[in-house]
Curated annotation (Swiss-Prot):
Zn(2+) 1 binds at C29, C32, H53, C56. Residues 125-173 are annotated as: VLG 3. Residues 68-113 are annotated as: VLG 2. This is Protein VACUOLELESS GAMETOPHYTES. Disruption phenotype: Missing formation of the large vacuole required early in development of male and female gametophytes thus leading to development arrest in embryo sacs and pollen grains at the first mitotic division. Residues 179-207 are annotated as: Disordered. It comes from Arabidopsis thaliana. Residues 190-199 have a biased composition (Gly residues).
Length: 248
């Protein structure tokens, strides 16, 4: 039986081979740090745990984005300057895999945040919300998310209705879409409701993937904080032991 052909990707030193993810696999993509869904590539070396969604494999190397019009964003396969993580300038969460980056401005965006929809319908507001890339008020004013009541940093992306001065950060809108998708992808009735057509099911699926990404990034941030605290405690314990030995 002939073996499946292998392919190369600039993010990894070894050849990759195509596979189809199973629900029970629980494997993390090395590009976006999310659970593998659908088609993916795996390193041909048995001892190498490198996995990549086909969608991450196919990401363009350079893009232009409305959030950063002055310079192109370049796809990086790991954080800059040998850092283990970066902070996304769209949602404010950590990332450790692929990022779209402007080295001139030190601007980073998750590969998932780059593709969020430009408009979003939220059940708590009558009008569609438009994606904007900073808070719609002066920096000395406080802007609060109308969904979760959290204060929103001025430099992060949000969904906003200018007519009503109603805004919600990415997490709030995406969390609602995730709940809708769990219930079968159905939105509100009447005009703009999903009604079960294929286009809205696809949009719901994409928003569900984004919600999973943001959830994974928040969990990663918590793990990194816990690891940092553990390292600090270890350093303190080591210094204490040295001090005790000097006293003996």
């Amino acid at each position: 039986m002939a073996s499946r052909p292998s392919v190369r990707h600039p993010s990894h030193n070894h050849p990759l081979r195509g596979h189809k993810a199973q629900v029970e696999d629980e494997i993390i993509c090395s590009g976006c740090d999310l659970d593998l869904l659908g088609a993916y590539f795996k390193c041909t070396k048995s001892e190498c745990d490198y996995f990549l969604h086909k969608s991450c494999f196919d990401l363009p190397r350079e893009i232009r984005h409305k959030s950063h019009p002055d310079h192109p964003l370049i796809l990086l396969y790991s954080p800059q300057n040998n850092n283990s993580t970066y902070t996304c300038d769209a949602c404010g969460e950590y990332g450790s895999g692929f990022t779209y980056n402007c080295s001139i401005c030190q601007y980073d965006v998750h590969v998932g945040c780059v593709s969020v929809p430009e408009t979003m319908k939220h059940d708590e507001h009558v009008h569609p919300l438009a994606l904007i890339y900073k808070a719609p008020c002066p920096k000395d004013h406080i802007f609060t998310c109308d969904v979760c009541d959290e204060t929103m940093p001025h430099n992060l992306w949000l969904y906003y209705c200018q007519k009503c001065d109603y805004g919600a950060h990415l997490h709030s809108c995406v969390a609602e879409e995730e709940e809708k998708s769990k219930k079968g992808g159905r939105g509100r009735g009447g005009e703009g409701g999903s009604g079960g057509n294929g286009v809205n099911r696809g949009r719901s699926s994409a928003n569900s993937e984004l919600a999973a990404m943001l959830k994974a990034q928040r969990e990663m941030e918590q793990m990194q904080i816990a690891l940092h605290l553990e390292m600090q405690r270890a350093k303190i314990d080591k210094k204490s032991r040295k001090h005790m030995l000097k006293m003996i």
